[in-house]
Amino acid sequence: MTSAPIPDITATPAWDALRRHHDQIGNTHLRQFFADDPGRGRELTVSVGDLYIDYSKHRVTRETLALLIDLARTAHLEERRDQMFAGVHINTSEDRAVLHTALRLPRDAELVVDGQDVVTDVHAVLDAMGAFTDRLRSGEWTGATGKRISTVVNIGIGGSDLGPVMVYQALRHYADAGISARFVSNVDPADLIATLADLDPATTLFIVASKTFSTLETLTNATAARRWLTDALGDAAVSRHFVAVSTNKRLVDDFGINTDNMFGFWDWVGGRYSVDSAIGLSLMTVIGRDAFADFLAGFHIIDRHFATAPLESNAPVLLGLIGLWYSNFFGAQSRTVLPYSNDLSRFPAYLQQLTMESNGKSTRADGSPVSADTGEIFWGEPGTNGQHAFYQLLHQGTRLVPADFIGFAQPLDDLPTAEGTGSMHDLLMSNFFAQTQVLAFGKTAEEIAADGTPAHVVAHKVMPGNRPSTSILASRLTPSVLGQLIALYEHQVFTEGVVWGIDSFDQWGVELGKTQAKALLPVITGAGSPPPQSDSSTDGLVRRYRTERGRAG
């Protein structure tokens, strides 16, 4: 499959048309948009799978959307999308296919990439995971002393940690086998020590998640965890209390893990896209293979929508392009994600890696410098906590911060309110709807004065509005719905990356710091005075640290 040249999107007529359009409507208030088009609240919506998405409170018109779609076609979005699904090596800097979508293909699908039957390979690993977790959950698999495993500890970092942590918390209601999970990622020993403090080695299983089985933080923590285990149960216990998610059989075997209990994945799966691969083993132990299959099916619903829906009604495309509209034409630096669900409290952190590691690039895929800002900064907290922390800036600050609100109609937890007029979940969601409304429409000085506010206070209470947001609603938080939400953002990232002309699937920016850390470790720990560093700041910091540690400075 041949590829069209990657255009410098800012040098195209489509970009110029959007720039002129922004000059025309950029200062128009959402109050005016709704007055001019009263039906937009019903019509600027899209339903896909179990998600209802309202994008009417964005500073766009139907003309804006048409121009953004034209921009996407100018960037060959449909062609690039089809190449990704077909297994073309669109990760050009590493010469790799990008096939996280293959992880959720049904068993009867067909996809051969580089001569390999990808679907067969994926389901072989899923079957192995299912067989193992069935044994663990039933009690057939026991620890070295014969006791059942009650806690799994996932040791990983980056995509091997952020995804499992987020999903475990989000799907806690679906844990059904008496097994809990904990997660260790930070090389700071406080992380591991706190995690193990109240655990029984005899009932603890460790999952070491590292593709190469050489990731510094992961192997450092895994080695310390093995020492904790063997101090209590002896060296022979390792094979009953450790399994691996890796592709390096030799190093896994050297560690003491039976390679029959090693679950693999592929170089066409990036870490931040891997929670639905064997990296999700800890999740399957907790929720079981059937719920995990529902999770994968949710991803696939959005995959098919993204692959087949016209761009004009394609949810990830529309949301990705709207994000780009704010980044490149309004100068917005960030997007906040506000789940009105405490179980999704780690979802913004998960999206930080997904979006910022993917699109935080200053070089286009062809090696030339980018000509526009790339990479939205994602952040957020669950509602209503955020309302009492940073919503002040959203409402009355000088920075434009588009917001994504996520909520559910049917709670998995609920309690009545003291007034008896509804439930706590109703109270939560009334805040959801109120915040999107106030962000959009605000309250004018005249309205505030009419309330009897003293004249000298009126200006301080003005709510300017015109703050854009997306509202995403689903019936309830299920494994499938969570998969749909994740895939919705995955494909937004792809959409933006294609338009910007960057490679969204490499992450060279994280490598140099790791290399430098390895070089500095002997400098800060070695005997004798350390060699001078190449800059006076690092040199001074190293010497200060060594002095505080009682080493020669």
From Swiss-Prot:
Function (record text): Catalyzes the reversible isomerization of glucose-6-phosphate to fructose-6-phosphate.
GO MF, any single term: monosaccharide binding
Name recorded for this polypeptide: Glucose-6-phosphate isomerase
Active site: E357, H388, K514
Family affiliation: Belongs to the GPI family.
Quaternary assembly: Homodimer.
Catalytic temperature dependence: Optimum temperature is from 20 to 40 degrees Celsius. Retains full activity up to 50 degrees Celsius. Retains full activity up to 45 degrees Celsius (for six-histidine-tag protein).
SUPFAM superfamilies per record: SIS domain (SSF53697)
EC class of the enzyme, as a word: isomerase
